[in-house]
């Protein structure tokens, strides 16, 4: 009987810890939404809140017009663990901070360790944006042997034309696979579809109309609320992420 009680207490404690972690991760997602980062989109996996799907759209610099998919893997005890989240690109990406073999992004130069309550995922994504906007500036003051791809760094400093050509090759290859069948059945995986006039045309027209004319406020907005886009957390529910 005592053993059963102890086991139940352990199960309850584990459940409570899991729920607390889920809400902390939900808070991180809400912060990302509020920051409105341009050209970068992420969403937690439906099946596992420690795995996030993301897409980066280059808007300036050498990586303009790039569309790079990536995955974020959070440590098991995130955000209380000092271990850093892992960002892995799903294709070849030449960059001094990206390992050419694992496609992993080194964020340790900006985040030596994860500080719970001080470091947040939106800052991590902002760092990703910054180093792709200006890769040369991102390696200033860092020794070549401390970079994940020292050859890329050297090429960037000595032969920018060749570096840009390599970047363009990456961009071309990534776009060739943008409409590929998703590698997972997870419903939160970010999927792109080719434009279909009958499906997407009406939506495009509504977007254009919205730019030229202010739409009438919804009932929710009229009552002091605000409209939101599609979310993986259903409106009116408090169940976040993968809690069943």
Swiss-Prot record:
It comes from Drosophila erecta. It holds the Pfam family UQ_con. CDD domains: UEV_AKTIP. This is Protein crossbronx. Belongs to the ubiquitin-conjugating enzyme family. FTS subfamily. It comes from the Eukaryota. Residues 20-176 form the UBC core domain. InterPro entries: UBQ-conjugat_E2_core, UBQ-conjugating_enzyme/RWD. GO terms for biological process: defense response to bacterium; sperm individualization. Residues 209-244 are annotated as: Disordered.
